[in-house]
Amino acid sequence: MKQSVSAEQIELKSSLPGSKKVYVDGPREGMKVPMREIEQSDTNGVPNPPIRVYDTSGPYTDPAYKVELEKGIPTPRHSWILERGDVEAYEGREVKPEDDGVKVASKHTPVFPQMDRKPLRAKQGANVTQMHYARNGIITSEMEYVAIREGVDPEFVRKEIAEGRAILPANINHPEAELMIIGRNFHVKVNANIGNSAVSSSIAEEVEKMTWATRWGADTIMDLSTGKNIHTTREWIIRNAPVPVGTVPIYQALEKVNGIAEDLTWEVYRDTLIEQAEQGVDYFTIHAGVLLRYIPITAKRTTGIVSRGGSIMAQWCLFHHKENFLYTHFEEICEIMKQYDVSFSLGDGLRPGSIADANDEAQFSELETLGELTKIAWKHDVQVMIEGPGHVPMHLIKENMEKELDICQGAPFYTLGPLTTDIAPGYDHITSAIGAAMIGWFGTAMLCYVTPKEHLGLPNKDDVREGVITYKIAAHAADLAKGHKTAHQRDDALSKARFEFRWRDQFNLSLDPERAMEYHDETLPAEGAKTAHFCSMCGPKFCSMRISHDIREYAKENDLETTEAIEKGMKEKAKEFKETGSHLYQ
């Protein structure tokens, strides 16, 4: 009897403290766009308005929703897809044991109950990509949805997609996803990588990591599984994922040929693309820019080729002494992508893996090829984003952004960090967040998170939380620097709460309320400390904000408005302060 993954096997948490799930009604019946509303307490009887923020947590934080992982989450978008009349349901390919990396299916594998569902594809001659609709002047329901999330006009969304500056990753077989957009003129997004390996993790653990990552703010998920049960793990994740899901198909294709790179073929890879597209993967990382002639250039590098996908294709090219089959079959890949609206994430297989290799000939040669491939994909109206480095010192980061925008005609940039130094294993979420904040400011549309386990091991769910929060900080800092019109509202609300000693509001407005309260309560755990006009850093006598309050009150009581009057008042106050023994609080 096949096993199942249940909600009891994983930890699911409700909404964050002081928050509640709310929905904004869209322009069409039944369209409800999720937001998180953070409540605030009053200031001396004067109400502070609730703050609404972008929410990626899906239905899991809705108290009215009953979690049943074996059924998957709701599919409100399904009707939008069908009503356009350009898709058809079909039998799909047969799921085989080798899809899960085994010769015989195991009775112990928790197969998703609805794996026999019929996938959708475009009807003969149709193109179902959001870019195709946008270029034909159509504002889809998906575009209207993301316009509400971003606080912009739907026509602006359509135009950005039509011109290739943004992508709306939305496979027609992933109707569970709550739509989002990736582009430099929108909020900077964060991706979280999850996935098993040959030596670690289970299906339940990966589903839990997905719900955990989205709770803390991951905008997309990449399933980078390389162990057994790849197909089944991905099915459980997609059916329960409220955010777009990306993959690197070459990983599964390699499993199908027993991990021997030189045995890879276009036919095996093509079959894998269709398999994953039928499941509902929203974007594929495809390392089509690793060309045979570029591989020798990497021989001079300190760390060679560090991309897993890049090294697989380099090994294949060298063994056969042939051009990369992902490059030679790129037009055929585009034909597959546009049948399902899978977006390209053109992989940087030659990204630098060390500071010494940053911005070298190999890296930028591949980027030139990615620019060429972008034009081909756009010819098919297939959505494209470009993957970027890697390990880059701060003074070389801006050049990466400028070259990408120029060479790839403004396609969204999606970067891994970049890490700004190589000397901090165990802290690479910090070394990379520095670079991520900078490159986000310069124009990167999505940041791929790095966890503290980078270069050391497979991250657990606590590492996922740390990585997501760290990168949400970087993304938000970039939004502030770019002048995003709503970015500062949460900062202003938290600053006001801090100055007014509304401790619970400070916690609740933060990116990680639980961590903030935990640190505060380590030294001041009493409930009364939540209303105290000091914290344990300065204590009651040296709190700068409390002193500022005293100064304001003094100015108000003495009707001091001009600089001259304030200086006079300060002299009087200084005299009084000395006469009372130099004590701040009596």
UniProtKB/Swiss-Prot annotation:
* Comp. bias regions, Basic and acidic residues: 22-39
User: What are the record keywords, sorted?
Assistant: 4Fe-4S, Iron, Iron-sulfur, Lyase, Metal-binding, S-adenosyl-L-methionine, Thiamine biosynthesis, Zinc
**Which cysteines in this chain are paired by disulphide bridges?**
none
Q: Any binding details for the cofactor?
A: Binds 1 [4Fe-4S] cluster per subunit. The cluster is coordinated with 3 cysteines and an exchangeable S-adenosyl-L-methionine.
Instruction: Identify the cofactor(s).
Output: [4Fe-4S] cluster
**Biological process GO terms, please?**
thiamine biosynthetic process; thiamine diphosphate biosynthetic process
What general EC class does the enzyme of this chain belong to?
A: lyase
Query: Which Pfam families does this entry report, sorted A to Z?
Result: ThiC-associated, ThiC_Rad_SAM
Instruction: Identify the pathway.
Output: Cofactor biosynthesis; thiamine diphosphate biosynthesis
Q: Which residue stretches belong to region Disordered? A: 1-58
Q: Report the catalytic activity.
A: 5-amino-1-(5-phospho-beta-D-ribosyl)imidazole + S-adenosyl-L-methionine = 4-amino-2-methyl-5-(phosphooxymethyl)pyrimidine + CO + 5'-deoxyadenosine + formate + L-methionine + 3 H(+)
Which molecular function terms from Gene Ontology are attached? 4 iron, 4 sulfur cluster binding; carbon-carbon lyase activity; zinc ion binding
**GO cellular component terms attached to this protein's record:** cytosol
Is Iron there in the keyword field? yes
List its EC numbers.
Answer: 4.1.99.17
Answer whether the UniProt record assigns the keyword S-adenosyl-L-methionine to this protein. Answer: yes
Highest taxon above the source species? Bacteria
Positions binding substrate in this chain are: N193, M222, Y251, H287, S307, R308, G309, D348, G349, L350, R351, E387, Y414
Q: What positions does the entry give for [4Fe-4S] cluster binding?
A: C535, C538, C543
Q: Can you tell me which residues bind Zn(2+)?
A: H391, H455
Its biological purpose is as follows:
Catalyzes the synthesis of the hydroxymethylpyrimidine phosphate (HMP-P) moiety of thiamine from aminoimidazole ribotide (AIR) in a radical S-adenosyl-L-methionine (SAM)-dependent reaction.
- Name the protein family: Belongs to the ThiC family.
Protein name (record)? Phosphomethylpyrimidine synthase
| Species whose genome carries this gene | Bacillus thuringiensis (strain Al Hakam)
